[in-house]
Amino acid sequence: DLLSEYGYDLMDTVDEYIPTPERDERKPFMMPIEDVFTITGRGTVASGRIERGVIKLGDEVEIVGLVEDVLKTTVTGIEMFRKTLDEGQAGDNIGALLRGVNREQVVRGQVLAAPGSVQTHEKFSAEVYIMSKEEGGRHTPFFSNYR
């Protein structure tokens, strides 16, 4: 049908015009953890979008951040949109099944990373500008220990 023909032509033109983004695969693996859940009988899964690097089945990783201790584990499964994979690359949204990790040991905001590639920091210096109410910013003040 005519619509299908033009639709395919349009998408071919778009594919030619817009370059495919390059994936940052040469740097060490790192994935911010967006969600954590348990699969009964299998274990704990950390999900998120891989920021850089490649992760493969059997790779050792560290869970870093928000707690003092770094937790070491092994990736025993990788899934993307209910498809089992042998590896995940930068840009992929995956779930990584983690060996010997309890659900309570992993939280959103931590990072799954290649061993020794990420360090945590407890303090940093910053200069912050807070927009006024008139500028479209906050209407109420910040209080001590604001999170």
Curated annotation (Swiss-Prot):
Signal peptide: none annotated. One of its GO terms (molecular function) is GTP binding. It comes from the Bacteria. The keyword GTP-binding applies. GO terms for cellular component: cytosol. Its main location: cytoplasm. Induction: By elevated hydrostatic pressure. Keywords: Cytoplasm, Elongation factor, GTP-binding, Nucleotide-binding, Protein biosynthesis. Belongs to the GTP-binding elongation factor family. EF-Tu/EF-1A subfamily. This protein promotes the GTP-dependent binding of aminoacyl-tRNA to the A-site of ribosomes during protein biosynthesis. This is Elongation factor Tu. The gene is tuf.
